[in-house]
Amino acid sequence: MMRLRTCTVAATLALMLAAACTETTGTPEGQMLALSVSGLQPLASGFHYEGWAIIGTTPVSTGKFNVDAQGNIVTLTGAPVAGGIFRTDRDLRGASAIVITIEPAGDVDALPTATHYLAGALGSGAATLTVGASQALGNDFTAATGKFVLATPTTATTTDEKSGLWFLDLSSGSPATGLSLPTLPAGWKYEGWAVINGVPVSTGTFTAVNAADDRKLFSGPLAGPPFPGEDFIVAAPTGLTFPTNLAGGTAVISIEPSPDDSPLPFTLKPLAGAIPATAADHVTYPMTTQTSGFPRGSAVIR
């Protein structure tokens, strides 16, 4: 009996040592990154996320990924990434920061895009990833403020005044800047939206709050003011009719990746304002900050 017990213990120890050796030799210590994220949206049109460890001044890819409809980390083919663990062929323990970027479809190079989404400095091999990190957007947008009016300056008629949304301030009697937003880093743009009967319709993308945005897809023939906004007069999307009445809808400012993976609003929406059901034209209405649900994450080098 003693001999049998000794043999059994020896065999068990041998199996444990073999398993330990297999785990160690499979991925050496310091070459794995465990990611956990919340609030990310699935990217469309082949766009995807990619992790980077910043070693010195060199970005080292820790792997490409997307998230599913439940926010779980998945491969580019949709398979689950067990434990959010990515294996690399580099020792990551000398990294100073972890950065998550948004990469375009077909990306094969070894460099990150300018669209840095989440990031965080590493300390003791771990990092908290936020939008506000200096390596990401560099601002948490909690100080953002906004105002808007309903008006249709691009038409001569006065019967459609509630069919235009402009991010400006008329409280002084003269048009003034209605948005207070930080300057975005490369790879990002702001975009205005009017939610009409539950449908988000873009007013255009912009980077300056005191200049016209980049398009007037739905506006009338006259010139608009030098501020972001749109009149909804022509070329209504399917299911909508222009001119319309924006009262009872919502005005939104989003932050969009550039280039963008989708024509729909992105997750980052720092400002929103309900348009009263009894809204009057040429009256200034406020927007409120909406940053509590911004994505977050953590990264641990193993």
What are the roles of these predicted feature ranges?
Residues 1-9:
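Bacterial N-terminal signal peptides that target proteins for export
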Residues 8-11, 48:
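Hydrophobic alpha-helical segments
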Residues 21-302:
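N-terminal targeting/export leaders
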Residues 1-2, 16, 32, 287:
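Detector for methionine-enriched segments
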Residues 10-18:
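Bacterial N-terminal signal peptides
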